[in-house]
Amino acid sequence: MATYIVGDVHGCFDELQALLELAQFKKNKDQLWITGDLVGRGPKSLETLRFVKSLGDSAKIVLGNHDLHLLAIHQGIHSDKESDKLSALLNAPDCDELLTWLRFQPLFRRHPEFNFVMVHAGISPQWTIQQAQGYAQEVQNILQGNEFKKLLKNMYGNHPASWNDSSQGIKRLRFIINALTRMRYCLLDGSLEFYSKLAPEQTDSTIIKPWFEINTLDQSSDIIFGHWAALLGTGTKQGIYALDTGCVWGNSLSMLRWQDKKMFSFACQRQRVHSK
């Protein structure tokens, strides 16, 4: 059994299928891990969710910020924008079933055999990996319970920027969600910084650094993440794997086979799109 880990799909269903064919993925034998953001901005979010759900236990995903945003749209908390390209999914007869399945997916996964963990955006340098797993479970318990709508309504915002283990309620949950699904840069003390969208080489490293460059980062396990398409899979230290290579932006979809660390890539077949 091979373990394949693919970066953010964002509804790029055709590219995902081509990539799996290229790697000779066997759905009844192999496992497919996905770094989150299955949906949003790409043309086939509905087909992507249906396919991944159909894989059953062969698929292991974590939730990304776009997946959480989709859940909020479905609950009427936010409106569906044309740029999200989610209308086909939201109007599908199996939408409720698909999004219930999505809501019960985790924010953090640890492989039971290999020494790696997978999250969408990263692990806060103010946490250990073991703490991150526990904090993710706090959010999952609410997301999978009766109070999930309240959580989805109040998860938006950039504060608090620094972790305080004594914090409670939505501030605590928002930090956990932001660290696991939105984080790119941190201040040197490990607090979250959401205002810079530049590539790392264009930033002042005496003020902010990529989260994986903060020296307090726990690397007791390898860390696999997506989210940060501008990295194009490069620039991380040993044991840190960035797999979002910006397929939805016109670049490519990338997938790592863990056993031999072979990387597979398939170029986007559509016209390049631009962020607004």
Swiss-Prot record:
MF-aspect GO terms: bis(5'-nucleosyl)-tetraphosphatase (symmetrical) activity
Enzyme class: hydrolase
Coiled coil: none
Cross-referenced CDD domains: MPP_ApaH
Catalyses which reaction(s): P(1),P(4)-bis(5'-adenosyl) tetraphosphate + H2O = 2 ADP + 2 H(+)
Cross-referenced HAMAP family: ApaH
Family stated for the protein in its record: Belongs to the Ap4A hydrolase family.
Stated name of the protein: Bis(5'-nucleosyl)-tetraphosphatase, symmetrical
Organism listed in the record: Psychromonas ingrahamii (strain DSM 17664 / CCUG 51855 / 37)
Organism lineage: Bacteria, Pseudomonadati, Pseudomonadota, Gammaproteobacteria, Alteromonadales
Gene name per UniProt: apaH
